[in-house]
């Protein structure tokens, strides 16, 4: 089934593709000329047979003489098994979606509007967008070689091999180098940075990155995402639940961030202590904690009572608007759909049945294939795979070496100049900002080189004209070596 469903080329007839184009775009009032190189980056076995390909989309500014001081950003999404579609057409490329002020727009049906990305980072950095093996236009040509790519460390090592070859091919080893990952792409970035400076299973890479830009952080001190984190997960989820409750119910007149930080302070002190005390908590204190938890999160006291004050990620999705008969999006808690019922199937999935995925997936896919690829002169008779859910079964989530949080901490220890910027959406239930706070504190990341910032958005936090401007301006600040939080 893997061959038939997810492989649109075989090694017998595979020919590496390469497409070139040129363009110019106005960014911050100035014209920026550039060239693009979109191509297969092929992996071969010991007898020269192609077994896989990473597909890359390189945007290179052409009027720059000193490339040694010009940063290169390598950007990708997550999954694992997800193509670069979201970050590519969302905010990194020279063309992007036109956003509206209403997060519940656009319609899921065409026509869709694509515009020049006047927020693009190409004025300050060259950009390489990456489709990993078996995602997007990336290919797994030999299914028997899946274990060389579809696992945490092999995936990261494949990325490093590609980056090493790209830097050599385009003479950019002396340039500042940044990894930009979204969602699982954050784990990929952390593991790649750790292996780059410390070595992989069979080889060294001897590479250092100037910084990591982590959008929708998935790195934790646990095994995989939030597995085996030695703390109460509802405490980490508290800021996200509070933000979504603020958006839908407006329990106070406080600004969003003021309310969320107040909720976080309650969660990390009174709420956490109450959970720790359990049945030893006096009834009067229990009732007070239950009331305040319901006030901040929007989850009913009755539900909290039934679950001993705790709530999970799925409870944020299903309980905050339960009285309205609506489900929230796991990827953007502002977006809703009518409540899932048994008539729709027996198994509710917070991924497949997600309101934001249903809304934005068709928009991004059509814009990328219908507008962006033709502009890049890409003409390829190959199926573009936005996300390969098969990886959920085939992708090995266990590490043979260090956990993702340990890899990041080790990389920052070995590379004293490496800096990390966590950018998170307040309304993102999938990768909650509380996880980033906890990671920074419990992986003991250097405080002077670690920056965390929340945005009034969801998992794809660049959605919205104000959000994409804020994010890209903050990335520009980060690339200058400054603190993104220093901006108002």
Give the location of each predicted region.
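A catalytic-pocket lid/entrance helix-loop region that shapes and gates access to the active site
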Residues: 95-99, 193, 197-297
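Catalytic histidine neighborhood in serine/cysteine hydrolases
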Residues: 444-460
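N-terminal cap/lid subdomain of alpha/beta-hydrolase-fold enzymes
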Residues: 3-6, 48-148
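Catalytic histidine-centered segment of alpha/beta-hydrolase-like enzymes
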Residues: 458-468
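Alpha/beta-hydrolase active-site loop
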Residues: 121-125, 132, 149-169
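Alpha/beta-hydrolase fold catalytic core
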Residues: 280-430
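Alpha/beta-hydrolase fold nucleophile elbow
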Residues: 172-184
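Short alpha-helix in the alpha/beta-hydrolase fold that links the catalytic acid
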Residues: 418, 432-442
């Amino acid at each position: 089934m893997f061959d038939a469903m997810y492989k649109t080329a075989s090694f017998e007839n595979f020919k590496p593709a390469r497409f070139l184009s040129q363009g110019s775009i106005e960014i911050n009032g100035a014209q920026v000329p550039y060239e693009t190189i979109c191509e297969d980056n092929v992996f071969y076995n010991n007898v020269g047979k192609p077994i896989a390909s990473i597909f890359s989309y390189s945007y290179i500014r052409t009027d720059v003489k000193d490339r040694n001081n010009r940063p290169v950003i390598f950007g990708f999404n997550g999954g694992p098994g997800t193509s670069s579609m979201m970050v590519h057409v969302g905010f990194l490329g020279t063309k992007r979606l036109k956003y509206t002020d209403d997060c519940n727009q656009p319609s899921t049906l065409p026509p869709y509007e694509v515009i020049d990305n006047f927020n693009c980072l190409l004025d300050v950095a060259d950009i390489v967008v990456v489709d990993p093996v078996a995602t997007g236009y990336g290919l797994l040509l030999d299914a028997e070689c899946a274990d060389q790519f579809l696992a945490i460390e092999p995936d990261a090592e494949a990325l490093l091999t590609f980056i090493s070859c790209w830097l050599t091919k385009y003479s950019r080893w002396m340039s500042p180098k940044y990894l930009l990952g979204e969602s699982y792409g954050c784990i990929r970035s952390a593991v790649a940075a750790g292996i780059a400076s410390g070595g992989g299973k069979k080889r060294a890479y001897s590479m250092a990155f100037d910084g990591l830009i982590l959008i929708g952080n998935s790195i934790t001190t646990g095994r995989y995402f939030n597995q085996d984190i030695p703390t109460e997960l509802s405490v980490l989820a508290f800021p996200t639940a509070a933000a979504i409750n603020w958006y839908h119910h407006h329990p106070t007149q406080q600004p969003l961030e003021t309310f969320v930080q107040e909720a976080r302070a309650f969660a990390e002190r009174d709420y956490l202590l109450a959970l720790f005390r359990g049945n030893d908590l006096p009834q009067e204190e229990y009732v007070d904690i239950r009331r305040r938890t319901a006030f901040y999160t929007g989850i009913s006291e009755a539900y909290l009572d039934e679950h001993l004050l705790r709530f999970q990620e799925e409870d944020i999705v299903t309980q905050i608007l339960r009285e309205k008969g609506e489900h929230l999006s796991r990827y953007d808690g502002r977006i809703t759909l009518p409540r899932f019922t048994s008539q729709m199937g027996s198994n509710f999935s917070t991924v497949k049945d997600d309101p934001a995925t249903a809304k934005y997936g068709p928009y991004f896919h059509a814009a990328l294939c219908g507008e962006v690829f033709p502009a890049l002169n890409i003409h390829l008779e190959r199926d573009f795979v936005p996300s390969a859910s098969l990886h959920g079964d085939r992708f090995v989530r266990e590490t043979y070496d260090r956990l993702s949080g340990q890899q990041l901490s080790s990389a920052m220890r070995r590379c004293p100049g490496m800096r990390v910027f966590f950018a998170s959406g307040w309304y993102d239930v999938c990768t909650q900002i509380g996880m980033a706070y906890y990671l920074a504190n419990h992986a003991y990341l250097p405080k002077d080189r670690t920056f965390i910032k929340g945005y009034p958005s969801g998992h794809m936090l660049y959605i919205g004209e104000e959000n994409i401007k804020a994010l890209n301006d903050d990335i520009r600040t980060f690339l200058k070596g400054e603190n993104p939080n220093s901006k108002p």
